């Protein structure tokens, strides 16, 4: 298996899943600032020119792009991290789509307006931080009666946690959400999760409490965002 993640929630979803499933894989890191994700070779893997993507060398170099699709493929390939019965599978997919259609887009936009844009557009910041927090409360309420999102540990937990763990970076508080915090701690206690978020190794820490460091990291990421504003977004 070949994987092209980046130190970004969507990339971490795939690297965590690969570690949890104990699948051997080759990590290929693209230089996004140089536009390596837009080369003809990579566009054959993902026509949208974004990461992550995986190539299954055991299946005639079958390529999968979009992080959620990668997670589903890996789960179905191995028969792990997602039930095979219709109801169990549906529970996992519901919470996976909750992340893909809600948590990810809302937190992603909160990051952009709160951390990256040189101009501060407060209504946009308030909108995306507020919606992210509302979605956090949905998770907190559901986790009051469930150890993991679908009941048992799954790709849905991996997908949501990869984003929720960066709440500080988005400027969103998790105060008053004890069930969400319990789940976050449970996820972080898993060795494969800890290893997955180190793939690829990076000096960027989206959970830092050091505001000076946060500004430094934001400046590094801002260049990619500016590229995205010109129509060449990478993530």
Language-model features, listed with the residues they occupy:
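GST-like fold's C-terminal all-alpha helical module
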Residues: 74, 96-191, 233-235
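A short, terminal or domain-edge coil/loop segment
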Residues: 88-89, 138-145, 168, 198-214
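Acidic/histidine-enriched, glycine/proline-rich intrinsically disordered or flexible terminal extensions
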Residues: 200-235
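Domain-wide signal for the mature, well-folded portions of proteins, strongly enriched
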Residues: 5-15, 19-22, 26, 31, ...
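GST-like domain detector, emphasizing the conserved glutathione-binding G-site
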Residues: 1-126, 130, 227-235
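Short, structured secondary-structure boundary patches
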Residues: 45-51, 196-200, 216-219
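Short secondary-structure boundary/hinge segments and terminal tails
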Residues: 35-36, 185, 204-206
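Generic structural signal for individual residues within well-ordered alpha-helical segments
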Residues: 43, 90-93, 159, 181, ...
């Amino acid at each position: 298996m070949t994987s092209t993640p980046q130190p970004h929630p969507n990339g971490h979803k795939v690297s965590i899943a690969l570690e949890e499933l104990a699948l051997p894989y080759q990590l290929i890191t693209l230089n996004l600032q140089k536009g390596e994700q837009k080369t003809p070779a990579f566009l054959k893997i993902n026509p949208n020119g974004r990461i992550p993507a995986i190539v299954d060398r055991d299946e005639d170099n079958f390529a999968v792009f979009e992080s959620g699709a990668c997670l589903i493929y890996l789960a179905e390939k191995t028969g792990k991290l997602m039930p095979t019965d219709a109801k169990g599978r549906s529970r996992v997919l519901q919470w996976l789509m909750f992340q893909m259609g809600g948590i990810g887009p809302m937190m992603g936009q909160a990051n952009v307006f709160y951390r990256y844009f040189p101009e501060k557009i407060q209504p946009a910041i308030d909108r995306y931080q507020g919606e992210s927090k509302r979605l956090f409360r949905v998770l907190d309420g559901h986790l009051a009666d469930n150890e993991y999102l679908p009941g048992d540990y799954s790709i849905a937990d991996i997908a949501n946690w990869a984003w929720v763990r960066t709440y500080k970076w988005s400027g969103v508080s998790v105060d008053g959400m004890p069930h969400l915090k319990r789940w976050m701690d449970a996820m972080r206690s898993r060795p494969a999760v800890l290893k997955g978020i180190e793939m690829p190794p990076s000096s960027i820490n989206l959970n830092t409490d050091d505001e000076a460091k946060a500004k430094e990291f934001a400046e590094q990421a801002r260049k990619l965002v500016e590229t995205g504003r010109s129509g060449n977004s990478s993530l």
